[in-house]
Amino acid sequence: MIKFLVKGQNIETLEHEIIAADQIAFVKIHFVFDNNWKPLHKVVQFTQDEITYNRVLGTENTSCFLPAELTAGTVKMSLFGYDAEATETVRATTVVKTLHIRPSGFEGENNNVPPTPDLYQQLLEKISEKGKDGKSAYEIAV
């Protein structure tokens, strides 16, 4: 398991293992948040070669899978969070944590990787899940 503590604007490693390339929905990253982060809507960002992949955690989730598009090399990971209930804009950010992905031994015919949904798609999915309990969009918003 890979586990990080998000404390203030810093990401500290709690548990780490070697990450190999070519994984799909296999490497799970778990976060422990300090009290300042707990009420925030959280998003993890993974950046490699100037391409950023977002994983929405929301307010309840504390883990996500590493995006399958990441290849061997270095990856910059950071988080941001915002308080949708606040009267003034609140956005928390972290410094970048560098992850290292090693080449795998995978040699397969089908190297197609399903794309990670972009941030907008993930947020729409969260909104549609909220409406399943019979509440209207207005009731969800207030």
Language-model segments: what does each one mean?
Residues 1-108:
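N-terminal assembly/attachment segments of tailed bacteriophage virion structural proteins
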Residues 102-142:
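Collagen/collagen-like triple-helix sequence repeat recognition
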